Amino acid sequence: MDLSSSPNHPITVVSTFASPFEGPPSVGDSNSSARKPISLWPGMYHSPVTNALWEARCKIFERLLDPPKDAPPQSELLTKTPSQSRTTILYNFSTDYILREQYRDPWNEVRIGKLLEDLDALAGTISVKHCSDDDSTTRPLLLVTASVDKIVLKKPISVDIDLKIVGAVIWVGRSSIEIQLEVSQSTKEGSNAADDVALSANFIFVARDSKTAKAAPVNRLSPETEQEKLLFDEAEARSSMRKRKRGDQERREFENGEANRLQTLLAEGRIFCDMPALADRDSILLRDTRQENSLICQPQQRNIHGRIFGGFLLHRAFELAFSTAYAFAGLVPYFLEIDHVDFXRPVDVGDFLRLKSCVLYTELHNPDQPLINIEVVAHVTRPELRSSEVSNTFYFTFTVRPEAKATKNGYRIRNVVPATEEEARRILERMDAEACI
């Protein structure tokens, strides 16, 4: 399939493992190819969805894997429509047993962490489609995930019902593009499209010249329909808001009111530290909720540019956040949302990645749905250089599964209190960020 392929033909996702009930393909099978299987290509994260995407766009990606030497940059910017980048992915869970088992979690729902990886992979494919100039003599752009806007799970995603992801470019700046993805699953016949949407996500990618690493201009976008124009305007407003927030954050200082809030937060923490026998048993120190995970980033986890791709980091952060909420609550947690994520520093193959998590605070005003707010900080550590830098900070919100909560009468989620001013500041900054949304 080349770039001119119609976006109306969805890409079907299939399992990456051969079924034990099927024999090997025959020699004359039209699905066989002299080209090496996509699963053997180096420098790629492999999942059913990324395999499908790479097979569908192999001409583009083969050029990215082996770009022309000393090729000139793209000389002319094209104008494209959202429909030209629109891509649809189908997960045939109802008929593909192997695929279903690859995505099943212990509660018979789709693994959210694995889905996050697929969303990032699809967003990357869409960004490449939009930025391609259809000229094999020019060098391709380096496209990296810059940030992910808030991702909210609107309803549970079953692993037994077919799933669809649709994505397209909805906005472009000079060197950045925004891709909107919608995950849909129809659980009732006759339901409308809006009710079918289980999750939506907006990814922002930035373009760099693959030779100079400087910001590079991207193809223009021309919205056609009223809905596309509305999405473009909304994305433009979000871009302006992000710029304002960055400026506000640089100027932000704690005033007298903030100092009072700090002292209120720290009051109970001091009781825990100085008189633990008298501390509130319905509370717990933030430091006692911490979890940690470490790993060496392997070549198999890299993207086409040789860096660890953002979806892998999202998946790892989600798994640690889920475990942190599980250990804290004592009941199986239920994922609700991920707040805005900035990918501040690239992660390279061979990096020593440390993920540190904690329960930052809880919201207990609704006893039927207590909220557990988890912070996960990713540190890129280089022992030989004695350096450690923050790559990403993730914020996840969980509650507890109703069916799990029903098994414990009188169950309560504990309040989390800080022991240091630094912890209190982190809590206040997070609360204020949530209040501004």
Swiss-Prot record:
Origin: domain of life: Eukaryota
Keywords of this entry: Chloroplast, Hydrolase, Plastid, Repeat, Transit peptide
Tissue specificity statement from the Swiss-Prot or TrEMBL entry: Mostly expressed at low levels in glandular trichomes (lupulin glands), and, to a lower extent, in stems, leaves, flowers and cones.
HotDog ACOT-type domain mapped to chain residues: 89-211, 287-404
GO molecular function, one term: fatty acyl-CoA hydrolase activity
EC number(s) recorded for this UniProt protein: 3.1.2.-
This protein's GO CC annotations: chloroplast
Transit peptide feature, positions: 1-13
Classification via InterPro entries: HOTDOG_ACOT, HotDog_dom_sf
Keyword Cell division (UniProt): no
Subcellular location field: Plastid, Chloroplast
Gene Ontology process terms (BP): acyl-CoA metabolic process
Top EC group: hydrolase
PROSITE patterns: HOTDOG_ACOT
Function: Acyl-CoA thioesterases are a group of enzymes that catalyze the hydrolysis of acyl-CoAs to the free fatty acid and coenzyme A (CoASH), providing the potential to regulate intracellular levels of acyl-CoAs, free fatty acids and CoASH.
Family: Belongs to the acyl coenzyme A hydrolase family.
Protein name stated in the entry: Acyl-coenzyme A thioesterase 2, chloroplastic
Species classification: Eukaryota, Viridiplantae, Streptophyta, Embryophyta, Tracheophyta
